[in-house]
């Protein structure tokens, strides 16, 4: 239980988070803030980090390693058998053996997390501490749970999976900062997530990216007349989105070129908002007749105004524009990699094709984020798109016993 002092402090944080509106497309709407305000936010964020030191140390970033990896690599048919022999003979330690397993990283926003809107206290706690239990990284062996991408990959190979995603994460300029609310819940924007990966000695073999949904709040900062004619605004947002996405992606590619193992990067298009709004409208009707159903449905409208019915059409329109920018961006980057044999970048619309029109796929609390069934559908769709990248990396059902250096990390011994 919390001490009285900690409880009072956190209660104040919850009230602040509830009172202060969320800022989505910050670089378009936010004026420069006074220095004392910036310093106050910095101090408050550091205080929360100090209070939650146990959480920050224990789960930053959340990682899962195949539990029986040692038994699996000890099989002569394993591609990592030679690494296992080196470990048994004392040439490398256990940590180095784990580093030689395939590493997979996930970058994204709240749609890659077990996240939904609830009471401020519950939302804060879950955003800061709740990891796993999502379509990318779920380790629950219960057949009724999510069969995550991590678990599906385990059928082929032992691996290490790490999630860098965070609720509220944006595709924003690296110079924009993460903002106070995002720092409080320990969220990093795309550039910050990329920076985390770039700091690691062991660079991932496979990087999956699904982010941009928080960039869709196109009404933020616009007057009523401007909302009537948003064409210029939407195009500005799409153009800036591509610039801000390209910078961290290029940094990851540049690092990948220096690695002595193959690297595949998969950029996923945004969710199918057209089908999502069909389900949300059903939820709105049910909530109107019985407010206990989808109890936090209105919270989404308050913090993300573009979810409101008058603005949904242009939100869908913007999502398609951003998907087009990502597709074009990846195509250009792929052409630049023509002479690089160890880096592959791919755009996938697999997650954009998930049909969210069914009520059971959206969360029963806020009718905004995916439900458990929604996470199951996303896991199946995402995994179905990984075939070309897994083949490029040499990960698959028909792995042979011969060593595969493209999968092994050969650091200094």
Over which residues does each language-model region extend?
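N-terminal secretory targeting modules
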Residues: 2-3, 10-13, 17-160, 203, ...
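Short, solvent-exposed loop/turn and secondary-structure capping segments
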Residues: 115-120, 176, 218-223, 277-281, ...
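Conserved SGNH/GDSL esterase-like catalytic core that processes O-acyl groups on lipids
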Residues: 122-250
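A short helix->loop->beta-strand "cap" motif at the edges of active sites that frequently abuts
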Residues: 256-263
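Substrate-gating cap/lid alpha-helix
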Residues: 276-346, 372
């Amino acid at each position: 239980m919390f001490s009285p002092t900690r409880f009072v402090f956190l209660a104040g944080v919850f009230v602040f988070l509830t009172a202060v509106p969320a800022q989505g497309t910050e670089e378009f709407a936010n004026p420069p803030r006074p220095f004392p305000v910036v310093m106050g936010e910095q101090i408050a964020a550091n205080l929360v980090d100090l209070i939650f030191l146990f959480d920050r140390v224990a789960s930053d970033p959340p990682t899962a390693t195949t539990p029986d990896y040692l038994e699996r690599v000890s099989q002569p048919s394993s591609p990592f058998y030679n690494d296992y022999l080196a470990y048994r003979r004392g040439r490398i330690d256990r940590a180095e053996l784990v580093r030689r397993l395939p590493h997979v990283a996930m970058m994204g926003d709240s749609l890659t997390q077990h996240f939904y809107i609830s009471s401020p206290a519950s939302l804060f706690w879950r955003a800061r501490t709740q990891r796993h239990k999502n379509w990318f990284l779920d380790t629950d062996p219960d057949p009724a749970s999510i069969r995550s991408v991590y678990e599906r990959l385990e059928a082929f190979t032992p691996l290490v999976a790490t999630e860098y995603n965070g609720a509220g994460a944006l595709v924003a300029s690296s110079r924009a900062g993460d903002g106070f609310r995002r720092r409080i819940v320990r969220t990093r924007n795309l550039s910050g997530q990329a920076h985390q990966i770039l700091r690691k000695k062991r660079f991932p073999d496979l990087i999956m990216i699904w982010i941009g949904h928080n960039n869709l709040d196109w009404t933020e900062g616009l007057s009523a007349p401007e909302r009537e004619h948003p064409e210029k605004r939407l195009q500005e947002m799409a153009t800036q989105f591509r610039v801000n996405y390209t910078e961290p992606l290029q940094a990851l590619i540049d690092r990948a070129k220096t690695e002595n193992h193959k690297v595949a990067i998969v950029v996923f298009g945004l969710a199918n908002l057209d089908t999502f709004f069909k389900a949300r409208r059903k939820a709105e009707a049910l909530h109107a007749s019985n407010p206990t159903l989808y109890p936090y449905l209105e919270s989404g409208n308050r913090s993300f105004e573009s979810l409101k019915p008058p603005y949904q059409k242009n939100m869908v329109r913007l999502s398609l524009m951003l998907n087009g920018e990502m597709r074009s961006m990846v195509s250009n980057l792929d052409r630049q990699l023509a002479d690089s044999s160890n880096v592959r970048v791919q755009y996938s619309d697999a997650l954009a094709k998930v049909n969210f029109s069914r009520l059971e796929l959206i969360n029963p609390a806020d009718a905004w984020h995916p439900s458990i069934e929604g996470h199951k559908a996303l896991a199946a769709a995402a995994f179905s798109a990984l075939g070309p990248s897994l083949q490029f990396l040499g990960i698959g059902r028909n792995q042979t016993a011969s060593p595969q250096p493209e999968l092994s990390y050969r650091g200094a011994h």
